């Protein structure tokens, strides 16, 4: 067993919390239990360094990329989906699940639903990524296209749940979802125990809260930085104001996986308590990071998946000389958007 490596049986070790559950929605025990449940379905994803990327970053930074874009369905959200479906009762599964998504949450739920024979209904906004829509349908999900953005599609999903009595699988406001996201950081803590910092993109905040929960318990020296698209900055703005926020205008970013316009009650208090800092990056910065990943790692990522690296580029003076982990959260970019990025139209 390598240094810093932990293994959990079906009954993980008890590790005391450092904050009340009212602030932190999950514990390390919850994440360990989620990992045990999803282990048969979700392989450990690579955590890999690239000397050519280090050279491009400069400032004596060494970076490791957590390749969630290599997962089944191409994103970290499959962890969340299996964490949720393996925790539901038989009766909850029988009634089916309903969710709103811009794609990756829905793909994960459709994949897990097909695995367990659970009916899945997904609500997406009009004009959603057509390739993500195609993928969800291919996995057997019922797709409802309604609303101008994620938040309006979420309202549609809540209406369907009230009418049909199904289970609402919220992409953030669910402890099983957050615990599933935390399994990624549990792997990171074991794969590279000597990190100084993690840089993580934030939409609703499940990744970041999962990461902070793990690092506070296992690697308390690791500082977690959050980054959000400037065109969808409700959580960033609320964090700096120390107050929950909902914006009336639709999110505007090609990083559709981050395109939300509100904070969420289960994640926002922990984000306020635990983050080292929270920054925004423009679509141009995200597109630059995406092209850099294509050139230096030869892996395909979507806008949300490149946002962590965009954040590291913005923070590279502050993180000079450090060992930094960056989550590549997904790779489901459609061909039209990829063409625009490669042609420097974004």
Report each predicted region and the residues it spans.
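PLP-dependent amino-acid enzyme catalytic core
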Residues: 8-346
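Low-complexity, intrinsically disordered Ser/Thr/Pro- and acidic-rich segments
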Residues: 1-9
